[in-house]
Amino acid sequence: PNHIGLHTYEKSISSFQGTQKLELDLLRICAEEIFKAVPNNYDGYVASGGTECNMQAVWIYREYYKNVLDAKNDEIIVLFSEDTHYSLFKVCNILQLNFKLLNVDFNSREIDFEKLDNLLSELKADGVKYFITVLNMGTTMFGSIDDIDSITHLYKSHNIQFKIHVDAAFGGFIYPFTNPNNVFNFENPNVDSISVDGHKMLQAPYGTGIFLIRKGLIDNVLTEEASYIEGLDHTLCGSRSGANAIATWMILNMHGSKGLMDHMEQLIIKSDFICKSLSELDVQFFRNEYMNIVTILSEDIPRRICEKYTLVPDTHKGQPKWWKIVVMEHVNWQLIDNFLNDVTQYKNETIHNLRPNQAIL
């Protein structure tokens, strides 16, 4: 089925109303049950993935600033951390928007707020008036979570216009279930839009991205010229398959909220065990306690072990600084034990090889 258009509006193409209702219910589950939106106070659609969702969000906010505040492109800037998904570089290039990378601490992966404070002052002095910020609910490499409260407090202290899109491509189907104090949702008035990938934690077919935004903002990108389409089209992609929406709806209903929570908690238990064991071996790593990503400092683990267990490097160009473990359902206890045994053996060999030098000293 072709799910072209935006089905959160009353009028849409009548040919596939049955499957469109499933997409609407999928949006309801995600917006209302997971991200705490007020019923019927949001728009959204099932996109091709996180890249399209990020593009859709920044496009909407660019047009919002132009339509509502008469902004010019060079008065708008996009801010995101250096750990943010690479799609933002594409987005800014295509939309012809300037951007600034926000520095993060090497160990904590937290945005450096002192530098951000200085940057905001510099940008305002240079004539930048309108800010679009992409914050992360689970970065690709680290699973790190940006501090939305501190960032928005800083923005308000500078008295600037800002819109915030939450890139929850990875974390959106785990973090809200594992962290009862999650503030990345529509109860937070500073959150304007959220996107989450179904093909990551839910293992829905590629590519499945779910884009959600507060009601009415998406009107800024209505394509008036699509007059031959029954209904309204506000989407970047236009025609799109309804199959992914149907599959994701079925997966969520198969699990149920309790089943999905139990599933994610099992991944956290395994991640906790890996981290506890690595700490006992004096292996340095980064992990957010509510996420299933464990990222190990490269100097504490040899490449041969990383490649044996298909850990993901932060770069394929030169020497990686970090190696990533993503704890999914296939990561069973036997695999975890084998990995930790290999790391233990490596650490023991390293200590043994150091002993002769230590004796000389």
Label every model-predicted segment.
Residues P1-H3:
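Phosphate-/polyanion-interacting regions in eukaryotic proteins
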Residues L6-E52, Y64, V68:
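Conserved N-terminal alpha-helix of the aminotransferase class I/II PLP-enzyme fold
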Residues L6-S15, P39-Y45, E75, F99-V104, ...:
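Glycine- and acidic
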Residues G18, V46-C53, F80, T84, ...:
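Secondary-structure capping and boundary motifs in well-ordered enzyme cores
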Residues E32, W59-E63, W249-M254:
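Short glycine/serine- and small hydrophobic-enriched flexible loop segments
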Residues S48-L222, I360-L361:
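Conserved PLP-enzyme active-site core in the AAT-like
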Residues D74, F89, T223-C237, K258-L361:
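Conserved C-terminal alpha-helix-loop-beta "cap" of PLP-dependent enzymes
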Residues F177-P180, F184-N288:
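Active-site C-terminal subdomain of aminotransferase-like
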